[in-house]
């Protein structure tokens, strides 16, 4: 688990091979102020927007 200050970098792994996220609900709060249903969803957003969104906490924002 890599931390950047108080924020945690999501473990996205090899996202290019993944096209869908699991439906498990484990909300994480991103540095963009959005709540994501799980870490995979945040990774998907990172990849789509090419932004370095980190996790501020393992809960809703």
UniProtKB/Swiss-Prot annotation:
Pfam family, one: Kazal_1
GO molecular function terms listed in the Swiss-Prot or TrEMBL record: serine-type endopeptidase inhibitor activity
Keywords associated with the record: Disulfide bond, Protease inhibitor, Secreted, Serine protease inhibitor
Signal peptide span: none
UniProt cross-references to InterPro entries, sorted A to Z: Bifunctional_prot_inhibitor, Kazal_dom, Kazal_dom_sf, Prot_inh_Kazal-m
Assigned GO CC terms: extracellular region
Annotated site (Reactive bond): 23-24
Disulphide bridges: 12-43, 21-40, 29-61
Record localization: Secreted
Domain Kazal-like: 6-61
Major place of residence: secreted
Coiled coil ranges: none
The keyword Secreted appears for this protein: yes
Record SUPFAM superfamilies: Kazal-type serine protease inhibitors
Protein name per Swiss-Prot or TrEMBL: Probable pancreatic secretory proteinase inhibitor
Species, as recorded: Anguilla anguilla (European freshwater eel)
